[in-house]
Amino acid sequence: MVQINFAKREINCKLVYYGPGLSGKTTNLEVVHKKAPASKKGELTSIATEGDRTLFFDYMPLELGKVGGMNTKFQLYTVPGQVYYNATRKLVLQGADGVVFVADSQPEKMDENLESFNNLEENLKEQGLTLSEMPLVLQWNKRDLPTALPPDELDAKMNKYNAPTFEAVAVTGEGVFPTLKKLAQMVLEKLNKEYGLQGGSKGASGASSRPGGAKKPAAAAPPPPPPPPAAKQPAKVAPPPPPPPPPPP
């Protein structure tokens, strides 16, 4: 769930990387954290479980600018891929504002991809959410492998929500940042619609940076009409002087 800190002028969004075990979720986050400027990222935290890890850190991308005059911060999370860590996946998924589903492009991994995708739908359903209303990006990872399925075939089998898709080789960084940037833009666009916040010139919407859009200044009231001229008073005539007194006898 989006958190808006008006005191810090900051918007916090949670993005979750979902997918089967060893599909490349952890690699995606490690690449982003390694290449992001030190001033724009928090500490990479890892919670180790047997055979898998949950990673998370804060990331403030420069290229997305501000929304409603506020900085945007994204909290990036991965979930453990193994089926027996479903309780952890549910916990990490709570409050998510968008999801990157990382699929393994190898044909022998298709069943695991579909099982994990169905699990994502079920866990969101328990929270009263669906992927049709949540920002979703699909990443076809491991495109460098010789047996990788064609993107069209992956799309036909997995993309029933018509989500944006990206090809990737996460170990080399290829496709990692375009995937993240697209999801971040989708989340901010949804935020604009729900909260009426509009982004600056570098934001997802490219609209005015003030909340609710720029307002035109009110037109100045016309000046009051001048007062009517005062009526002229007739000039006063001084009375004639009194006659002189008569001479004495």
Each PLM stretch: what is its role?
Residues 8, 52-55, 65-70, 90-95, ...:
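Conserved catalytic network of the ASCE P-loop NTPase/AAA+ motor domain
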Residues 22-23, 81-83, 106-108, 142-146, ...:
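Conserved nucleotide-binding/hydrolysis micro-motifs of P-loop NTPases
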Residues 43-84:
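Switch I (G2) and immediately adjacent beta-strands of P-loop GTPase domains
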Residues 85-108, 124-125:
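Inter-motif core of Ras-like GTPase G domains
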Residues 108-130:
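Amphipathic helical hotspot of TIR/SEFIR-family domains
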Residues 137, 143-197:
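Canonical P-loop GTPase G-domain recognition
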Residues 198-249:
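Low-complexity, Pro/Ser/Thr/Gly/Ala-rich intrinsically disordered linkers and tails that serve as
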